[in-house]
Amino acid sequence: MLGTLGSGFSNFPWLSASILFPIGSAFVIPFFPDKGDGKEVRWFALSIALTTFLITVGSYINGFDINNENVQLKENVSWLPDLGLTWSVGADGISMPLILLTSFITALAVLAAWPVKFKPKLFFFLILVMDGGQIAVFAVQDMLLFFLTWELELIPVYLLLAIWGGKNRQYAATKFIIYTAGSSIFILLAALAMGFYGTEIPNFEFSHLAAQDFTQKFQILCYVGLLIAFGVKLPIVPLHTWLPDAHGEATAPVHMLLAGILLKMGGYALLRFNAQLLPAAHAQFAPLLIVLGVVNIIYAALTSFAQRNLKRKIAYSSISHMGFVLIGIGSFSSLGTSGAMLQMVSHGLIGASLFFLVGATYDRTKTLKLDEMSGVGQKMRIMFALWTACSLASLALPGMSGFVSELMVFTGFVTDEVYTLPFRVIMASLAAIGVILTPIYLLSMLREIFFGKENPKLTEERKLIDAEPREVYIIACLLLPIIGIGLYPRLVTESYLASINNLVDRDLTAVKSAVKTNIFSGTKKNEILKAPTI
C-alpha cells in the first residue's frame, strides 16, 4: 500500500499544482464580503501561500533526485500546437532551489502584509497571482511560455507599487513597467528566432533549443538581447535605476518579493538561457559579465554608502550583492557558478529580512531619513537585535550564508585557469573594495539609527513600540536558513551540483573552441573543476 501511495505521489503534477493552485485560489478572493478589515481574506491568503509552499516541498521530497542533472518532474501537454506552444514544466538543480525560495518568501510576505487594511482583497489577490507566476518563471521548460510568465509577473508588481506605494508611487510603478516590459521585447524576439531556427514548425522547448547547432553570430545576437532583458531585472548597472525608485515607494511585503524573488529571476535567466542555451556566445561575453559584476559591487556599494534614505541604502546594497552572481556566472568554474546559485538563495533570504525590517521601522518612525531616525535603540531593543543579526548576515559574517556564497564565487574565479592571472587578480582586487565597504556602510547605518543623537521630536511624538511577536517570527524564519546554510552549505549546494557541473562542462567546451584572446589563458585542464562538496 505504501508503495502504491509513493507511486501516486511521484506521478502527481507537483509543479503545475504549485503554479495553478495559488493563481486559481486568488480568484476566490473577489467572492469574500467587503465588510470588515479583511481578516478572512488575510487568513485565506496565508493558508493558500503555506499550502503552495508545502506543495513545492513535496515536489522536492517525492520527485526530485539531487544526483540527476536532467530536468525532472516533467509535465508536457500540447496547448496551442499551431503556434508550437506547449504547457511544459519541469525542474532541475538550477530551478528547484529558486522554486522553494519563491514559495517560502511569498508565505512570509503574506504574513508581513497583515497590517494592510486598504483594499485587502485586491492586495492579496495580486500576491497570490504573483506567487504562481514567479514559480512558473522558474519551472517552465518552453521559451515562449517563459516569456508569457515573465510578463504575467509584471502586472501584479506594477499594481502593488502603483496602489499601495508611497507618495511617488505612480512614478516608480511607471518606471518599473517601462524598464521591465520594454526590455522584455528582446526575450520575445530571441524566443521566436530560436524557436523558428532552421524549421518552419516552431519548437520552443528548452531541450530542443539546447540541441540546436546555432551559429556563433546568431548566438551573439540573441545573447546581447537577452543580456539587456535579464540585466534590467538582475539588475546590472547602468540598467538598475528603476530598482531604488521601486524600493523607495514599496510596502514591506512588496519589498520582500522584489528583493527576495524578483531579482533572482534575472540571475536564473542568465544561467538558463545565456550560459546554457548559447554557450558559444557566453564564451565571448563571460569576461564582460565579470567586469559588469565588479562594477555592480563597487558602484552600488559606494552609492549605498552615500545614501541618507534607508530604503535606497538597502536597495543599492542589493545591487552590489547581485554583482557576485554575475562574477560567478562568468567564471567558467563549477565552484564559482555554484557560488552564484548560492548567492541568489542567500540574498533572497537576507534581502527579504532587511527590507521587512525597513518597513517595520518606518511604520514606527514614519521617516526614512537617517538624520531623523536616530537614537531609537533604547526604545526598540528587540528591533535593534533583529537589525544587527540581519545586517551581519548581509555583510557576509562567517557562519552565515552570505559568507559562504561570496567565498565560493571569489575562490572559484581566482583559482580557475580559464582567465589570465593578471585579469583575475585585477578583478578580484577591485571587487574586494566593495566587500570592504559593505560592513562600513551597514554598521554605520546601525549606529545612526539606534545609537545616534536622540531625536526628541521622534521619540516624544511617536510611540516607538518594540518588535511584536509576528515580526520576530518572520525574521526568525529567515535567519534560521541563513545560519543553517552558513554552517552547512550542503543543505542547498547538493541540490544543484549535478546540474551546475553539466552546465559548466557545456560552457568549457565552447571556451575551448572559441578564438583565444588575451583574457583567456587557454590553459584550462581537460578535467572540469567539480563543484564544492562543502
From Swiss-Prot:
Catalytic activity field: a plastoquinone + NADH + (n+1) H(+)(in) = a plastoquinol + NAD(+) + n H(+)(out); a plastoquinone + NADPH + (n+1) H(+)(in) = a plastoquinol + NADP(+) + n H(+)(out)
Record key words, sorted: Membrane, NAD, NADP, Plastoquinone, Quinone, Thylakoid, Translocase, Transmembrane, Transmembrane helix
Tagged with keyword Thylakoid: yes
Transmembrane segments: 12-32, 44-64, 94-114, 120-140, 144-164, 176-196, 220-240, 251-271, 285-305, 314-334, 340-360, 384-404, 425-445, 472-492
Gene Ontology CC annotation, any one: plasma membrane-derived thylakoid membrane
Membrane topology listed for this record: Multi-pass membrane protein
EC number: 7.1.1.-
Localization per record: Cellular thylakoid membrane
Pfam families: Proton_antipo_M
Gene Ontology MF term list: NADH dehydrogenase (ubiquinone) activity; ubiquinone binding
InterPro entries to which the protein is assigned, alphabetical: NADH_Q_OxRdtase_chain4 (IPR022997), NADH_Q_OxRdtase_chainM/4 (IPR010227), NADH_UbQ_OxRdtase (IPR003918), ND/Mrp_TM (IPR001750)
Enzyme class, first EC level, given as a word: translocase
BP term (GO), one: electron transport coupled proton transport
Function (record text): NDH-1 shuttles electrons from NAD(P)H, via FMN and iron-sulfur (Fe-S) centers, to quinones in the respiratory chain. The immediate electron acceptor for the enzyme in this species is believed to be plastoquinone. Couples the redox reaction to proton translocation (for every two electrons transferred, four hydrogen ions are translocated across the cytoplasmic membrane), and thus conserves the redox energy in a proton gradient.
Family: Belongs to the complex I subunit 4 family.
Annotated protein name in UniProt: NAD(P)H-quinone oxidoreductase chain 4
Organism: Prochlorococcus marinus (strain MIT 9312)
